[in-house]
A protein has these predicted regions:
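Ser/Thr/Gly/Pro-rich low-complexity, disordered linker/stalk segments of secreted
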Residues: 206-230
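Exposed beta-sheet edge/beta-hairpin loop segments within beta-rich domains
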Residues: 70-72, 105-109, 146-156
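Charged, amphipathic alpha-helical segments
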Residues: 86-108
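Polar/acidic, low-complexity leader/linker segments enriched in S/T/G and N/D
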Residues: 1-45, 214-215, 226
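Oligomerization/assembly interface segments of phage tail-like spikes and tubes
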Residues: 66-90, 154-167
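Beta-strand elements of well-folded, non-transmembrane domains
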Residues: 83-87, 120-124, 137-140, 164-168
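Mixed-charge, glycine-accented linear interaction segment located at domain edges/termini
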Residues: 136-215
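Short helix-loop boundary/capping segments
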Residues: 107-145
Length: 230
């Protein structure tokens, strides 16, 4: 799908049953956290969210001196996210770290699962498009710390990689796409599908899809950009 721009990114932590963690166990009181551009929330928005491996590898099957079939493997998406800044507490929780009594963030044993929605817009109509991943893990492969100079500052962005896993509500497929212009698309259901159990309700959730649906930007059930306690 031809899209333009990166409007925002939503994330949440999941428990072993696939439900969204909320409050002190999650990323916000509602469970859903928006990586917005509000400095008061510790965020500076995101530059890119590059999605790869949306299709599995293909293997030709030959017989009688001709190609008789093609086998297609399952998709194994990864998303590389480049954010200018993510709230530090949220960042640590996404990476599966827990805080000690002394304040240190230490990697936990096992895997911390999360979910992800990337919101963009269709290139021609400007209607919203959501790339959704109901289950996966976030990792950070490196941290490049450089000195400032007498003429320039050298900040490093928050760079994350999301590796998608099979999601049972989608027949164990790894991703889904929603388009605002589709009459069947209900904004509330997009978030219910990806973040089940969350109290977060995007603005416009009562609209039953379609081109006139208002744009989400708030929560009736809890802030999407106030980190939960720890």
């Amino acid at each position: 799908m031809a899209v333009r721009g990166l409007k925002t990114i939503y994330v949440a932590l999941k428990d072993a049953s696939g439900q969204t963690l909320m409050g002190k166990d999650g990323l916000s009181e509602s469970g859903v956290y928006e990586i917005d551009t509000n400095k008061a929330n510790g965020n500076l928005g995101s530059r890119t969210a590059n999605i790869s491996n949306l299709a599995g590898s293909t293997t030709k099957v030959s017989g009688n001196n001709q190609v008789v079939d093609v086998e297609v493997g399952d998709a194994a998406p990864t998303v590389t996210i480049d954010s200018n800044a993510i709230n530090p507490t949220v960042m640590q929780k996404l990476l599966g770290r827990e805080q000690s009594a002394s304040g240190a963030w230490i990697p936990k044993d096992g895997v911390t699962e999360s979910a992800l929605i990337i919101e963009t817009q269709e290139r021609v109509t400007g209607q919203r498009v959501w790339f959704a991943f109901g289950r996966g893990i976030m990792t950070q492969s490196s941290q490049n710390v450089q000195t400032d100079t007498d003429t320039a500052k050298t900040p490093e962005d928050d760079n994350l990689t999301f590796t998608a896993e099979g999601y049972q509500p989608w027949n164990n497929k790894t991703f889904a796409t929603y388009y605002e212009g589709d009459a069947k698309t209900n904004i509330a259901n997009v978030f219910k599908d990806v973040f089940p159990g969350s109290s977060f309700t995007p603005a416009g959730a009562t609209t039953q899809g379609g081109a006139g649906a208002p744009k989400p930007g708030g929560s009736a059930g809890g802030s999407a950009s106030q980190p939960g306690g720890h």
